[in-house]
Amino acid sequence: MNPADNILWGNIIKVHGVKGEVLVQVFSDDLTDYETLESVFVEIKQKQIPFFLSTFNFATQKRCILSFEDVTTVEQAKPLVGADIYIPVSKMAEADESRLSYQAIIGFEVMDTIQGKLGVISNFFQKTGQDLLMMDYQDAEILIPVTEEIVHSVDVKTKQVITTLPEGLIEIYLNEDASEPDAD
């Protein structure tokens, strides 16, 4: 399986119980769509390693308890804490595509309807007044307001965020970097 065909689904928060189970924070609104998963990919040393599931139990609306076939002790589970979990894009619930968390689209490419390919989403900020996506573009960090007029859609299969950025938005950030005084 090509890692590019997978999407970030969750993160292992901690070991749960004494049989090597793990508590997972899932970046999805409806876990019932995923209770039939047979396997997931756990990122270990920047590689996505397949883990087959023994059990999938609901903990809360956005958390589940997983047990893996070859992980049966706390000692085996501890090194997995903090690891990201990926699933194949093909396993992503259709309903979830419209409710993706910002965390899940980090690494997606920004495709603007006017300017074409721009950069990659590197972070997000959820603010009271305005959610923002951060895009890396020409060694600058561009903040993109998340509004219906600017961010049109997210294509999970191509890992693209489709936008129409306001005229001059990118230039504000590029000029800001160019106008910073040199430190002597």
Curated annotation (Swiss-Prot):
Residue ranges of coiled coil: none
BP-aspect Gene Ontology terms: ribosomal small subunit biogenesis; rRNA processing
Alphabetized InterPro entries for the sequence: PRC_barrel-like_sf, PRC_RimM, RimM, RimM_N, RimM_N_sf, Transl_B-barrel_sf
Record has Metal-binding as a keyword: no
Complex and partners: Binds ribosomal protein uS19.
Protein family: Belongs to the RimM family.
Function: An accessory protein needed during the final step in the assembly of 30S ribosomal subunit, possibly for assembly of the head region. Essential for efficient processing of 16S rRNA. May be needed both before and after RbfA during the maturation of 16S rRNA. It has affinity for free ribosomal 30S subunits but not for 70S ribosomes.
Protein name: Ribosome maturation factor RimM
UniProt organism field: Cytophaga hutchinsonii (strain ATCC 33406 / DSM 1761 / CIP 103989 / NBRC 15051 / NCIMB 9469 / D465)
Lineage: Bacteria, Pseudomonadati, Bacteroidota, Cytophagia, Cytophagales
